[in-house]
Swiss-Prot record:
GO terms for cellular component: cytoplasm. Belongs to the EF-Ts family. This is Elongation factor Ts. It comes from the Bacteria. The keyword Cytoplasm applies. Keywords: Cytoplasm, Elongation factor, Protein biosynthesis. The gene is tsf. It comes from Neisseria gonorrhoeae (strain ATCC 700825 / FA 1090). SUPFAM superfamilies: Elongation factor Ts (EF-Ts), dimerisation domain, UBA-like. GO terms for molecular function: translation elongation factor activity. Residues 80-83 are annotated as: Involved in Mg(2+) ion dislocation from EF-Tu. InterPro entries: EF-Ts_dimer_sf, Transl_elong_EFTs/EF1B, Transl_elong_EFTs/EF1B_dimer, Transl_elong_Ts_CS, UBA-like_sf. It is found in: Cytoplasm. It holds the Pfam family EF_TS. Gene3D superfamilies: 1.10.286.20, DNA helicase RuvA subunit, C-terminal domain, Elongation factor Ts, dimerisation domain.
C-alpha cells in the first residue's frame, strides 16, 4: 500500500476544497494516485449533492452582475445562515449572477444546468443543499445599477434607469426599504384597482355616509392605495416631503423598471424540534 503523506492530503485538499479526512480516504482508496483520488472525490461530491437535494434551502444570498447593458439579479439558497455567510458560498452566488448576465438563460432550470458542476463542488465542501431559486435578466438600451442591502445580502434591487447613476442608486435603496410593487400607476392591474374600489365602497356604505361623500371617500382611498404601492407615488425615504417621482424629475432621472428580491420570500422554513429529536434518540 502506498504511503499517504500529509503533503499529499494537503495538496488534494487545496485542489478540491474538501475536508482533510475526505481527501485522505480518497487517497487511500486510490492507493496514492492523486488524479484518481481527485476523480473519486468528484464522483462522491456528486453523490453527496444528490443525498442533500431533498433538504429545505431557505437561507441564502442575493447577487447581481452587470455586463454592459445586461444585468442579472439572482437568489441562491442554502440551508443555514452560517453557510450563507461563507465566502465560498458567496463566491458561488456571484458566479451564478455572472453566468446569468452573460448567457441570458431562459429558465431557472437552464441556469442551474450551467452552474451544476460548481454547485456540486460547493455542496461537497460545505455539506448543505444549495439551489438557484430564481433570477431575472434585464437586457436594455438604458442604464443599469444594483443595490444589495447590508453585509448579509438578503435584500436587493436591480434598477433600469435613464439619467444619474447616483440618483438611481438612491432610488434603489428606497425600493429595498419601501417595497413598491411597480414603477407607476399605469402598471397596476385594473382588476386589483377594482377589487380595492369594491372594498372601499362597501366600507363607505356601511359607514352611513351620503352617496356623494362616500364616492369622494372611495376615490381618495384609491389615490392613497396607488401612491403606497407605486414607486413614483411613494414618499421618498431620504426626503419624505417629496415623492420619488419628484426627486427623480428634479435630478433629470427616470426609473424605467426594477427587480426587487428578498431572500426566502415565500419559502416555508422547517421548524426543528430538537427536544423531540433528543427524546426519540434516547428511545433507540
Amino acid at each position: 500500500m502506498a504511503e499517504i503523506t500529509a503533503k499529499m492530503v494537503a495538496d488534494l485538499r487545496a485542489a478540491t476544497g474538501l475536508g482533510m479526512m475526505e481527501c485522505k480516504k480518497a487517497l487511500v482508496e486510490a492507493e496514492g494516485n492523486f488524479d484518481k483520488a481527485e476523480e473519486i472525490l468528484r464522483i462522491k461530491s456528486g453523490a453527496k449533492a444528490g443525498k442533500l437535494a431533498g433538504r429545505t434551502a431557505a437561507e441564502g444570498v442575493l447577487a447581481y452582475a452587470i455586463n454592459g447593458n445586461v444585468g442579472a439579479l439572482v437568489e441562491v439558497n442554502c440551508e443555514t445562515d452560517f453557510v450563507a455567510k461563507d465566502a465560498g458560498f458567496v463566491e458561488f452566488a456571484n458566479f451564478v449572477a455572472k453566468t446569468a448576465a452573460e448567457k441570458k438563460p431562459a429558465s431557472v432550470e437552464e441556469l442551474s444546468e450551467l452552474v451544476e458542476s460548481e454547485r456540486k463542488a460547493i455542496i461537497a465542501k460545505l455539506g448543505e443543499n444549495m439551489s438557484v431559486r430564481r433570477f431575472q435578466v434585464i437586457d436594455t438600451a438604458n442604464q443599469l445599477v444594483a443595490y444589495i442591502h447590508g453585509a448579509l445580502a438578503t435584500e436587493g434591487v436591480l434598477v433600469e434607469y435613464k439619467g444619474s447613476e447616483d440618483v438611481a442608486r438612491k432610488i434603489g435603496m428606497h425600493i429595498v426599504a419601501a417595497k413598491p410593487q411597480c414603477v407607476s400607476e399605469a402598471e397596476v392591474d385594473a382588476e386589483t384597482v377594482e377589487k380595492e374600489r369594491h372594498i372601499y365602497t362597501e366600507q363607505a356604505i356601511a359607514s352611513g355616509k351620503p352617496a356623494d361623500i362616500a364616492a369622494k371617500m372611495v376615490e381618495g382611498r384609491i389615490r392613497k392605495f396607488l401612491a403606497e404601492i407605486t414607486l413614483n407615488g411613494q414618499a421618498f425615504v431620504m426626503n419624505p416631503d417629496q415623492t420619488v417621482a419628484q426627486f427623480a424629475k428634479e435630478n433629470d432621472t427616470e426609473v424605467v423598471s426594477f427587480i426587487r428580491y428578498k431572500v426566502g420570500d415565500g419559502i416555508e422554513k422547517a421548524v426543528v424540534d430538537y427536544a423531540a429529536e433528543v427524546a426519540a434518540a434516547a428511545k433507540v
